Amino acid sequence: MKYLTLIFALLVFTVSAQAETVDYRVSGDVNPEFQAITLTLDPDMSTFTGVTEIHLAVAAEVSRLEFYQSGLSLESVVLQQGEQTWPMTVKAAQHDIQHASTGAKIAPGKYVLKISYQGKINDTSDGAYVSRFDGRNYISTQFEDMHARKAFPGIDEPDAKIPYQLTISAPEKHVVLSNTPVSTRNVTDGVQTVYFEKTKPMPSYLVAFAVGEFDSVPIEGLSIPGRIYTPKGQSQDALFAARRTAEILRYLEAYFGQPYPYKKLDFVAVPTFTHGAMENVGLVTYRSEILLRGENPVLAEQSTPLMVIAHELAHMWYGNLVTMAWWDDLWLNEAFASFMAARLMQDLYPEHNYETRLVAERAFGPDAAATTKPVKKTVRVAADVMDGLGLNYSKGEAILHWIESQIGSDAFQAAVREYMTEFAWRNAKADDLWRVLTKASKTDVGSMMRTYLEQPSYPLVVFDVDGEVQQRRYHLTGADVPEQAWTVPLSLKLKRDGKIVTQQILLNAEQQTFPALTNADWIYPNTEANGYYRWRIPQQQLTAMLQDLDAFTVREKKALLYNAEALLNAGEMGFAEFMSVLEALSLQKDPAVARSVVSVLAGFEYLIDAENEAAFGRFVESRLIHWFDALGTVDREQDSDDQLRLRHSVFGLLSKYSDNEAVQNAANDLATQFLSNPQLEHRQMAARALRAVAQRGDEKWLARYEKALTSSRDANVKSVIQRALNFKGEKLMLAVLDLAMSDTINPADTMSVISAIAMVQDDPVPFYAWLSKNLELLAKKIPDYHVTRIPQYVSRSCDADTIKLADELYSNVAGAYEGMTRGWEIAKASSEQCVTLKKRYQTTFNAYLTASSSIK
């Protein structure tokens, strides 16, 4: 670490921050200080009424006030100061901004902006919306990122961090929830009015409420009140989450060195939910299937709820207590929450073996695309936030993990604690984080990290035998990308004269020579796979490395294989050389390494067609059947998490491609059993079986799937079946699409059904005919976030004719939907890249399959 401290001081590569623009934000001369919101809500009504009072401080004379609203009907807008009242006229501007004027200048001072309005309870999973379950309606909210303005007028920006006070009237039979404890509750003529305590300062996107006939169970062991609320009749399915939440919260309090900062902690299982969960202050909302895993779920069903709960509770500090100043730093929230959740899983639940999971691998693929934007980018509208949203989580988390590995966990934790203390109840920017990390570690963290967060992609680091090291932007073969440079601290493992040693160097130019790297038998350039870069070494070193695989950890073995796959896709490694890596690692016995082999084999799917599918099936069987024979199809209590996951992935790939009788019989049996008597403990294997059966299934099978789907009350069962409706052929496809558009499939799940069916059709023409006819209806049903991404869900292809078909559709219609043009740009570029790769490797791949089938 001392060496790193010195070399970090020499960092020279930086990227200038983007210039801030404010045409899409309200004026900074008027600042909110407090907001009261009074709502009248009924889950059985499609509209609601509201009154809000926004307390404002006007710093300089202005001609108008500005606030946000979207889809609301403003009935009265007045400005108050003491006993004086001025009616205001309101004109809509861009970006949902409203200009309110009294007709005269507004002098500096304190004012109250009072607005009476009506709004709509939608069913598309954003704003204030309704979910339906078992014949009952439930209102919940999703205000991140720019959807609070759909429920109440206000300063809907993350740096407008103020206290709120909510008052909600609703029919007496309903449970009414919000961010804070109830202050008082009055009931008159069957209508309750619930007054909630004032909140701590928070941004508008964290305001939340829920109304419905909820059941609940207490969250055990908390120092503050807390319950899990579920749709009626499902509270007992929340017991696992209820009994694990307190230990998760205690871990986070210990790490941050301060107690949970709010007065209560409630969870709500929401039947219709676009994302996984939402970290609303004191009222965290989740997709039902995440929270409702029963009392004692099997090991395979535990990691998702634990991880998601940890992520959301980490947000109580990262994001809620300390909030990013604007949406261009959303990664500060999401990356830190993901980082903390993974650390917690390693420390608190080692049985899930998070230590061997490579988060960077989730980011490398999308980050390599020529269309990818930086994590820190200009954000004007909601579609900009969602553009590349996943990299806020995965790339951001990978970068934080890398920083921690470089400066040490103690220094990292000290910086986090200082950051939380300094910016509590305030907003922060990335530079604020870099400053405290630099102070705690005595290393210039910011100079390096800006090169990764303020420009897209990452470096490919190339080593030569003479110690020369070069860097250039990693990209897929044939892609046209600009030249870029990064500051790359490299932690190396190398073998020389029979001894394995570690070495740390700093690559801060496009090309440098390091004499310490000469005459090595091999160099492994990414110790413990902590760094965020790809690498290439001379072929003779790679050959020698494959003879020394026992010298590497599980993380390093997995990263070696994934790195080789990346080099193949970039045209930086030949097919034969890549297969030598794959074949060597396929002999490894560790289940985590074996699962990476399965993943890479599945990555060949873009090269599979009707002519070589049978040969590929035989090839996959030859590499994996021994695992199938050893692991079987039944999850056992004594299995490790890695064994469980390997069983699932092996069976998933074999059942899709292999004609092995035992495999196909197992798929039919598992599918039949699950459809007739779905059990959560068999869900993971059943999911693979159902997908395998569907791709060969007929009308009778589809009828069985639909019957099981419509008769189940279990969100997890529904999720499995919905994602397995990948039936082939026009007739079955149209039947599934009709199902997707019906009330059987809720708006948040509609695109998962449509994507599953669209991506498996041999003939794309009928699907695009359907999409062209039904796009408007589809866009009205699904969440806005899904509308922008329709091309990415259904139009990724590796066929030039299909790309042309999609292009004809989107060139005519995408402009009518915010963000869809960008969505098609991403999907089209990805598809064209796939065509390029297919042309490059198809002949070689077919020859390899032929040669492999001839080897006995």
Sequence positions of predicted segments:
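N-terminal, polar/Ser/Thr-rich
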Residues: Q18-T49, E75, F133-Y138, P158, ...
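Surface-exposed beta-strand/loop patches in extracellular or lumenal glycoproteins
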Residues: E53-G71, Q165-P171, D431, H475-S491
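A surface-exposed beta-strand-loop module
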Residues: G71-F133, T188-D189, Q511-T518
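Beta-strand-rich binding/interaction modules
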Residues: S73-Q80, V445-G446, Y458-N526
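Hydrophobic alpha-helical and helix-loop surface patches within well-folded domains
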Residues: L74, G82, F196, L222-P482, ...
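Long, ordered, helix-rich scaffold segments
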Residues: E361, G390, Q470, V481-P482, ...
